[in-house]
Amino acid sequence: MAEPSSSAPVGRPRTNLWLESRYRKLRRGLPQTVFFCPRCKGDRRRARDCTECGGYGKLTKESVQELIARRLLPAMQAKGGRFHGAGREDIDVLMLGRGRPFVFEVVGARNPAVDLEALRAEIVARAEGAIELAPFVPVPRARVAYWKETHFDKIYRAEVALEGVPTEAALAAARAFAGNVVQRTPQRVAHRRADLDRERSLQVLGLRALPDGALEARLRCQHGTYVKEWISGDDGRTSPSLASLLGVPARCRLLDVEEILTDDAVAPADPVDAAARPVTEG
């Protein structure tokens, strides 16, 4: 594949630019942005003796941000970059469908006039199946605020492990659920989020049995819904939950974002065929 040109006069003035795209995340264990160590915060001096990250400064080798930046910034001879996503998925969650919108802010680019399509193709090729990208589109800075401040419903696919066998009546009630749920700040994020009750809307689009006795659930959720906690109930902090509707303990063993319902998006009509999905486990 031809390398995108990055040659530019050394004395050329630097400029900032904003590139909008969407990413599909096809490998689990990949965070959206740099996953700095919570103990040393990535500080080189503190990282030397850090037992949390072993001196690495980060808890993962790569992120969506880094996979893009490692090729984009050198090609544009930029001083740095910032990743602005329209929300984020958990590190163990895939981002499928048309992908998650984002704006990559390129800071101090000396060579902004690169072939964006060649650059995108090079980034995807070097990511080796971890991500896919929509074409880059130069946009005004205001698009950062738009994606940060505008909230959209999402379609999820979840695999749910059960401890027990729900009744047919309970399954019917769960399949028919569409309404509001109240979620107290989940235990897993309570150390960094205010302890509040949040009300969110959720609709079950489908619920079917899998061969191993688990369930596959397809959900439409309001922005900010803690889907894993809605499935388990989070020790009573989410009500109603799928576990309470089914009458048996439940936990989310796998979660994918199938679509973000931006104004021009259409929700998938049918469940995604897991066997046909290009997914790399990590």
Model segments located where?
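Non-catalytic RNA-recognition surface used by pseudouridine synthases
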Residues: 1-282
